[in-house]
């Protein structure tokens, strides 16, 4: 029996973080939480998750934070969410190493589908 994938949810808004946890818990993932970029980096240094779902605009966030995540966890897919998006932000996000990008308010169904696909692809690559 394979262990269920570990998803790190990084979001400074408590209500949004709770909602994301509730939705992804229902998918059977093991969840870890962080409320800002620093907490997220510490969590990744302790143990690399299978996927990181993160806000962009939060304390210790931004594209330099995404770059640091990719340095510590180069093979970990990163799903980025932001309320301050647009075409340029999306292009930047993908260039800086995000695997998927969502504008807020996020459509939960689309988000769960992206998480499912990225985790499936990662399992295939890792064999």
What residue ranges belong to the model's regions?
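Non-catalytic signal-transmission and effector/linker regions of two-component phosphorelay proteins
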Residues: 1-8, 109-127
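Two-component/phosphorelay signaling modules centered on CheY-like receiver
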Residues: 13-32
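Acidic, metal-coordinating helix/loop segments flanking the phosphotransfer/catalytic sites
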Residues: 33-51
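Short amphipathic alpha-helix used as the core "switch/output" element in two-component signaling
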Residues: 42, 63-75
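Two-component signal transduction core modules
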Residues: 52, 78, 101-102
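Conserved phosphotransfer microenvironments
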Residues: 55-65
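Alpha4 helix (beta4-alpha4-beta5 surface) of REC/receiver domains from two-component response regulators
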Residues: 64, 85-102, 113
């Amino acid at each position: 029996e394979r262990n269920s994938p570990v998803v790190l949810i990084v979001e400074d808004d408590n209500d949004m973080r709770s909602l994301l946890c509730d939705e992804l818990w229902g998918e059977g993932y093991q969840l870890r939480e962080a409320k800002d970029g620093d907490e997220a980096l510490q969590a990744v240094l302790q143990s690399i998750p299978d996927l990181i779902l993160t806000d962009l605009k939060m304390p210790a966030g931004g594209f330099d934070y995404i770059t640091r995540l990719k340095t510590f966890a180069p093979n970990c897919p990163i799903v980025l969410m932001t309320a301050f998006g647009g075409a340029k932000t999306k292009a930047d996000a993908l260039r800086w190493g995000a695997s998927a990008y969502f504008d807020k308010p996020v459509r939960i169904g689309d988000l769960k589908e992206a998480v499912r696909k990225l985790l499936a692809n990662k399992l295939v690559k890792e064999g």
